Every structure is written in C-alpha cells, then in structure tokens.
Amino acid sequence: MDDAAAASAYNGGFEFKDGVKQANEYTYDSNGNLTKDLNKGISTITYNVLNLPNMVTFSDGSTIAYTYGADGTKLKTVHKIGSTTTTTDYCGNVIYENGVQKLLLTEEGYVTLSDGKYHYYLKDHQGNNRVVINQSGTVEEANHYYPFGGVFASSGNVQPYKYNGKEYDGKKGLNLYDYGARMYDAALGRFTTVDPSAENYFNTSLYAYCGNNPINRIDLDGLLLARILIYKVL
C-alpha cells in the first residue's frame, strides 16, 4: 500500500525518504553504531574509539571526514562531494571555511567575519533558533520545526545552527544534527549511536531522542536530557 499524502516538507525542509524500499536498510556494528543507511545512499560509516564518526562514505564516492581532539571535541570536517572539497575548522568559537575565518559564534548569534556584522537568533522556549536577524532587524532566515527537530519549512539558510542550537549538516542529504556526543537524525527521531549514558536511562531506547518526549524535554549534548520549565507570571 502506498501513502497518497502529499510531501510534508516544503521550502527548504527535510523529511524521511524511503529511498531504496528494502527489508534491511540500516546496518550497525557490534557497538551499536550505525554503519550503513541505504535511504541516504550511505554505504559505510567508520568510527573512532569514542564511537564518533571518522568517515561517512556515500555510494557515489562522496565522503565526509571528521577530526577530533582527545576529548571528542570536533576540530575539523572535510566534505568531498563530487569535485568540490569544503574544509571546516572549529577553533573555539571561531569557524573557518577553506582556511578563511567565516563566523565568530556568540551566546545569542554570530558575527560574519568577512564584514564584521552581527546576526542574532530569535529562539523559542526549547532553544531552537527560529529566526535569524541582522543588526538592522531584517529577517535573514526562518525555520519551522516538527517536535523531533525535522524542518517542515525554512527560508534563507544563512547559517547551520538550528534545532536546539545544534549544528545541522544537510550536505549530500546527510541531514544530521551534531549534539557533540553523537549525531541525531531528526527525520527518525533517533540518534545514530547508543547513548554513552545508557545506564542512566534503562527504561527507554538507547537511541531515543529525549526519552521520546520532545515537547517537555530537550537533549543538551547527546548525553543528558533536561526538562523544559515554563513559568507564568501571575
């Protein structure tokens, strides 16, 4: 039976796509790390000793490579897609692209270092970056999220920090958020690797996002979920 519903993602959004329609579309290693996602055309994912991805390889030969510090902090990402190579270096709160300073991250936004201009996030109660405005108040980007972080519509796409303020990588249809301790697939509502703090959450899936309760909780870093507190002034 085929679902006759129209697409649920519009204007820059993303959604789950059953790209191959096979019985086994996902493969995991003995540590529980995702090593293959046929729906995204990912043929292999290799990992380091911290169960962080070293290399993502697509069926057409495109790759995404990661470099980390000893504590697991991401230092570099190299996208090789077709004939184009893009290198992103992370030096504290300064982001370089192909060796050129690009962004200076701040608590409430970022500075584009090519022109020294400030850009500000307008966030919702979950810390999701819903709107980006420049220092004149002009809207540069707007994002509309499903509860689990999928984007059903967006405009602008001027910067990568979106749901929960996490870095989103949509290149080559990867569509993953980097939570630090592990990657998150919002189209599935699941992380790609086992929770390193699994012994604290024995009553839920090791891959579930914030205990399957994205309305009342957020995940801070792939290790720890937190309740959302909303106060009303009487």
Predicted regions and their residues:
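Acidic/glycine-rich beta-solenoid
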Residues: M1-H119, S136, S154-K162
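A cytosolic small-molecule/anion-sensing beta-strand core signal
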Residues: S30, V49, H125, D185-A187
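Flexible loop/turn segments at secondary-structure boundaries
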Residues: T44, N54, T63, R130, ...
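Short helix/strand-bridging catalytic loops that position acidic/His residues to coordinate divalent metals
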Residues: N54-M55, G165-K166, V194-E199
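Short beta-strand segments enriched in hydrophobic/aromatic residues
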Residues: V78-I81, I133, E167, S197, ...
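A motif-centric feature for acidic-aromatic and gly/ser/thr-rich catalytic loops and repeats
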Residues: E107, D115-G180, I215
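Short turn/helix-capping motifs enriched in Asx and small/polar residues
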Residues: S136-G150, K172, G180-R182, A186-L234
